[in-house]
From Swiss-Prot:
Keywords annotated in UniProt: Aminoacyl-tRNA synthetase, ATP-binding, Cytoplasm, Ligase, Nucleotide-binding, Protein biosynthesis
Key word Ligase present: yes
Family classification: Belongs to the class-II aminoacyl-tRNA synthetase family. Type-1 seryl-tRNA synthetase subfamily.
Residues annotated as binding ATP: 264-266, 351-354
Residues bound to L-serine: 233-235, 287, 387
GO molecular function: ATP binding; catalytic activity, acting on a protein; serine-tRNA ligase activity; transferase activity
Protein source organism: Clostridium botulinum (strain Langeland / NCTC 10281 / Type F)
Gene Ontology, cellular component aspect: cytoplasm
UniProt protein name: Serine--tRNA ligase
Catalytic reactions of this protein: tRNA(Ser) + L-serine + ATP = L-seryl-tRNA(Ser) + AMP + diphosphate + H(+); tRNA(Sec) + L-serine + ATP = L-seryl-tRNA(Sec) + AMP + diphosphate + H(+)
Amino acid sequence: MLDLKRIRNNSNEIKEALNNRGEKFDVTVIDEVLKLDEERRNILAKVEVLKSKRNQVSSEVPKLKKEGKDVSNIVAEMKNLSEEIKGFDATLAKIDEKIQYIMLRIPNIPNPQVPDGETDEDNIEIRNWLEPTKFYFEPKAHWDIGTNLNILDFERAGKVTGSRFTFYKGLGARLERAVISYFLDTHTEKHGYTEILPPYMVNRTSMIGTGQLPKFEEDAFKISEDDYFLIPTAEVPVTNLYRDEILKGDELPLKHVAYSACFRSEAGSAGRDTRGLVRQHQFNKVELVKFTKPEQSYEELEKLTNDAETVLKELGIPYRVVRICKGDLGFTAALKYDLEVWMPSYNRYVEISSCSNFEDFQARRANIRYKEDAKAKPQYVHTLNGSGVAIGRTVAAILENYQSEDGSVTIPEVLRPYMGGREVIK
């Protein structure tokens, strides 16, 4: 959520920034929220005058009573003032609700570093690592490799649940578990993150806090009778871990890593990478989340992105890093990098991680603040997160980039200790 004071003081700048985003956004709501804000401040000024008058009148009552004078008129005046204040308070509550409704639907403002552009075609490659894998034979897609090795079963998952679900079997299940363990060990032992095992269901307030609601409710799996949501990413519970709290400045940055299953309806994605492991309704992911001081956040974003890159380098998977343009930025991020791995069957790079700085956008929604010391005024933290990285897509990338002509798959060296020393799946 944006700072209302920032909108008040820089409305034209805010409108221009919102107009430059890819999705269509009706900037007239900025004028609407400013009109409501002005109305609210005018009423607050009137309420302050009435309260001051009521206090003044009230202070006269004991003296007049002591002098034996009739105070009935003053008591009546106090009652009228209280009723008038009560009416204004009711009006203020309605105005606050309208302002909140609008503010929750205004996207974040892109950081000046974000490049211009309308679609993912306009994203800018920052760097890459390793050349795309070359084969002397026709490489197979990971869904065919996994099916032939009897380690992935899409057909039976379709029978048991539906499309875009998968059974991992035998060494496939072990490979998935190995990747999870390797990622968690790397981020905790080498990069200094504290591990969190979060709930897989959250309440509506949590989804609002990280920006999934109200905009993306159609993409969420909801348990209607309890108003719970299956998490689309561990970012939601881990960020909300500190909702409505004031952190200590000397604790920042706080760094958490969390493994979780993730659940997404992927509404509107029909026909886009829907075969195999790339776009599933349920998938596993290791998430990196940081809480920082504002002046630290962009340095910490670079570190977080490098942490996510490390596991791809150690796995030996070709990848590139792209800076996301304004039109492809999404609702909550101020600046975002995507890590994309090379997928031979697609003959292109496929996103495996998004690393974002939300600045204070989520912190305002979730009311997460910090204080430098006991006497300092609380300030909003900056929140960051990135996949460290998606598990299913990592498995897919391993199967495709490490395949052999005979259909076997070489296991990356860093995963072999987690696979009982096994070197090949065949």
